[in-house]
UniProtKB/Swiss-Prot annotation:
Ranges of compositional bias, category Acidic residues: 799-812
Region (Disordered): 1-29, 58-138, 159-186, 724-776, 791-830
List of catalytic residues: 420 (nucleophile), 565 (proton acceptor)
Stated name of the protein: Patatin-like phospholipase domain-containing protein CHGG_02900
Mode of membrane association: Single-pass membrane protein
Domain of life from the UniProt record: Eukaryota
């Protein structure tokens, strides 16, 4: 068997390796190393026509770049196959264009054909073994293709131009690449001193940065030696080794409790006082909430004045205190003083909130409308949780262990984002159900990781010819297995209930980034977004995103623009997640090798306190902490100086300073422990033994954080349950994914609802972003009322009751499934650019459909 996505080949080199059980299994059973037990191991999810569509998209000419005079360089043209590109429906704008036969020579130029057939243009297809003589298949198949070509906005489209003879030397393309990599005239400051002092300043600052880096590494080495031979000696060292040897979370908790008992951390839990949260407020609210809940439970089902008063008091308390980081109870320092758990007062408060929320969800003494309004407000205040997987080349395989730890304890969030290598892991998680993931996250999965299998004699020639080590088409075939073929973001959401987000950066330096998900790019093919997010300059050339039409055909997305690695600008897109999904609690698994070295928590982190001086000391002593923090902050300062003064050159046409100047952490940051050998094998595929170690280390790094995550998700899932069960219209989203619809929900029940929804037939199991994602409920209701008045449904001077409004809304929801919760999160269709067939359009909206709202 070849790599992921390939057909079976009768070749010994392409067969999986023999099953070998390593000497250390890290708690995995022998069958976990058997590659034949992997689900869909020999399934080829990617049809040949999708590979051909990707090759054609890569071979197509780039959009016309601007020139300083406002025109366009060259004579590139962009072809629009109008029937498929417009998805078979009319748009809100019209183009008065005529179709001309290709033989007439009008509407395209000879330079286009030359550029298209050149070695540079066909490099990707040639590397994949696909012959590309002549124009693309779609152009040869039709003589009425529509072309748009113009040198600028004022030149006529159909003007015939005679191609000039090319007299430029063969090295002109290389010179053009160098010009694109250099700063343009608009980006370069004027003055006499700038060109004179630029390189001397760059040399001085670079030497200073190198010196600071050496001091930082030496300081970290000193702290490592200090902790190993001083802090972790004796009994505490033995307990620490016992914790690291565990393979199950329950065993780790037992070892962590023994460590806390040995260090005397239990006394800290009993004492309510702590400077990093308001213990007095928490204590008063806890007592009042417990009293109100017990009074309400004692009243039972009797509708008494005392019972109604108790429920109202409990409702007010819940609305007031179920908020993000209420009174500081979600401060990470509350979980950084012990190996397991937090203050007893905080834990009791969370337990009481859970019991009170469950009572309010199940009580029948509150109307459905009262519950709907209450849980809608609580959901907006409390927010949602997301798992963010960073990039890091083959370091990204540590994410498997983090996901496995969350999955086995049912703490895996519904919102998952990935960048670069993390996007591949996120795509695997978002396209598989919990049961499928448990069968996949084993060491035998290494047999499907074959992206770096080529010898140096193959990839070096490709790098010399194309500037990229890996071939985009080859990676597309392999990536398709991880995404279950050409699934789109919407289809993955409908299948599993998880919201996948992938960060992509445009090839243009100054264009905004995009966070692909089922709202911003619902019809975008996942594997194309994963490839774009992993397209590091020099490793993989920028690629074109693809979208799937109603007929299953793949076409270029976003007008054929090319995209590259998301880690170059937004490794962890926290702001975009907060804007689109109201995420304010993030679990970040950070494995970037250039960041891992500089991460240092001088006063401990969640589940990993400072061991000496009862958690009140400094890691490595005060002197060691001073050296590390001084060098780290000074390095950041000088990197910002280089970027602000425009001293940095642009190797491979990219500003690399943002690789260090981003925010790489979250509310909870997981840092898997790596080895020095991982740096030497950063672009090599792991074998089952190495992958078993990476999964184990990923689990070990996630275990200390699970208690903090569990307390958060216990409350969040009850809020989502109340929101889901009390939506207006009798559960208008039941045909889709219940757990993650709009505002999200529980992890387990939503997947069953998704399967049931799809089994019900087409249309019932499909979730679509509705107009309520853009308009508020009041605005939408007013709009529909106004339209009904215009139709004569409501006479002059008549008033409409709430029941009539609900009936009116039902007419609207016949065509659009309710996407509850998205109206809270401030969502927008920033890059959808597509229309969903079969979605009814309200008559009062003037024919505007979803694809036009961008």
């Amino acid at each position: 068997m070849a790599g992921p996505g390939y057909d079976r080949v009768d070749s010994k080199d392409d067969e999986p390796p023999n099953i070998q059980i390593p000497s250390r299994t890290y708690g995995f059973p022998p069958e976990a190393f058997d590659w034949s037990r992997l689900p869909d191991f020999d399934t080829n999810f990617l049809p040949p026509e999708h590979v051909e569509a990707f090759i054609q998209a890569l071979s197509a000419p780039d959009p016309i770049p601007p020139t300083p005079d406002g025109g366009a360089t060259g004579s590139s043209s962009y072809r629009l196959n109008s029937p498929a590109w417009h998805r078979g429906s009319t748009t809100s704008f019209d183009l008065d264009l005529a179709r001309r036969p290709e033989s007439s020579g009008v509407g395209f130029h000879d330079e286009d054909r030359t550029a298209r057939d050149s070695p540079a243009g066909a490099a990707t297809a040639a590397a994949a073994g696909v012959a590309t003589p002549g124009p693309p298949l779609s152009r040869r198949a039709s003589s009425n293709s529509l072309f748009i070509s113009a040198r600028n906005d004022w030149a006529p489209i159909s003007q015939r131009r005679v191609a000039r003879a090319k007299t430029a030397p063969q090295s002109s393309s290389r010179n053009d690449k160098k010009k694109k990599r250099a700063r343009s005239k608009d980006e370069t400051r004027e003055g006499y001193l700038y060109p004179l002092l630029k390189w001397p300043l760059l040399g001085v600052v670079t030497c200073w940065l190198v010196g600071l880096s050496v001091v930082h590494v030496l300081a970290r080495l000193y702290i490592t030696v200090y902790e190993r031979y001083w802090a972790w000696r004796g009994e505490r060292g033995r307990l620490r080794r016992a914790m690291r040897a565990t393979a199950r979370y329950s065993d780790w908790v037992a070892a962590a409790r023994r460590m806390d008992d040995f260090l005397g951390n239990d006394s800290w839990k009993v004492d309510d006082a702590f400077a990093y949260y308001d213990n007095k407020t928490v204590r008063r609210v806890l007592a009042e909430m417990r009293r109100s809940r017990r009074r309400a439970e004692e009243a039972g089902g009797r509708d008494t004045e005392q019972g109604r008063e108790a429920i109202e008091d409990l409702k007010v308390l819940i609305e007031a205190c179920v908020k993000n980081n209420f009174a500081g109870i979600e401060n990470p320092r509350l979980y950084s003083q012990t190996y397991y758990g937090t203050k007893n007062l905080v834990q009791n408060f969370i337990d009481e909130v859970e019991r009170s929320l469950k009572f309010l969800v199940e009580t029948e003494r509150l109307s459905k409308e009262e519950k709907r309004v209450m849980f809608k407000g609580i959901c907006a205040n409390y927010g949602r949780t997301a798992l963010c997987l960073s990039g890091g080349a083959t370091f990204a395989y540590y994410h498997f262990g983090v996901v496995k730890a969350l999955l086995e304890e049912d703490y895996l969030p519904d919102i998952i984002t990935g960048t670069s290598g993390g996007a591949l892991v996120a795509a695997l998680v978002a396209t598989r159900t919990n049961e499928e993931l448990k069968e996949l996250l084993i060491p035998a999965l290494a047999c499907r990781i074959t992206a770096c299998r080529e010898p140096i004699s193959v990839w070096f020639r490709r790098w010399w010819a194309t500037g990229a080590r890996f071939d985009s088409v080859d990676w597309a075939r392999q990536c398709a297995w991880w995404t279950r073929g050409s699934l789109t973001f919407r289809e993955a959401y409908e299948r599993t209930g998880r919201i996948l987000n992938v960060s992509c950066v445009p090839a243009d330096q100054h264009s905004p980034t995009i966070l692909c998900n089922y709202l911003t790019s619902p019809d975008c093919v996942i594997w194309s977004a994963v490839l774009a997010s992993a397209a590091v300059p020099g490793i993989l050339n920028p690629v074109v995103l693809l979208m799937k039409t109603r007929s299953g055909q793949l076409l270029p997305y976003s007008f054929g623009h090319k995209w590259k690695d998301g880690s170059l600008r937004t490794d962890i897109p926290i702001k975009a997640l907060n804007l689109q999904f109201n995420v304010n609690f993030t679990i970040v698994s950070q494995v970037n090798p250039h960041i891992n070295l500089f991460f240092f928590s001088s006063r401990g982190s969640v589940g990993q306190p400072v061991t000496h001086r009862r958690g009140r000391g400094w890691r490595g002593g005060y002197l060691g902490t001073v050296l590390v923090q001084f060098t780290k902050l000074d390095l950041t300062k000088w990197l910002r100086v280089l970027r602000s003064l425009e001293l940095l050159p642009r190797p491979l046409g990219q500003d690399w300073s943002l690789l260090w100047l981003q925010d790489f952490g979250g509310t909870v940051t997981v840092w898997p422990r790596c080895l020095l050998s991982d740096f030497a094998r950063i672009l090599s595929d792991p074998d089952p033994a190495r992958l078993a170690r990476m999964i184990h280390e990923g689990q070990q790094s996630a275990f200390p954080k699970l208690r903090f995550v569990a307390n958060r998700l216990r409350v969040e899932r009850l809020v989502e349950r109340g929101r889901r069960e009390n939506r207006r219209g009798g559960g208008l989203g039941d045909g889709g994914v219940g757990s993650s619809g709009g505002a999200g929900g529980g992890a387990g029940g939503g997947q069953a609802e998704a399967v049931a929804g799809q089994a019900a037939g087409p249309g019932t199991g499909q979730r679509r972003p509705s107009f309520e994602s853009i308009l508020s409920e009041d605005d939408l209701r007013s709009l529909l009322k106004k339209r009904r008045v215009e139709r004569g449904g409501i006479g002059s001077g008549e008033t409409e009751s709430e029941d009539e409004t609900s009936d009116l809304d039902a007419d609207f929801y016949e065509g659009i499934t309710y996407d509850g919760g998205d109206d809270d999160a401030g969502l927008e269709f920033g890059a959808a650019g597509m229309r969903q067939p079969g979605v009814a359009t309200p008559a009062g909206l003037g024919g505007v459909e979803r694809g036009d709202l961008s």
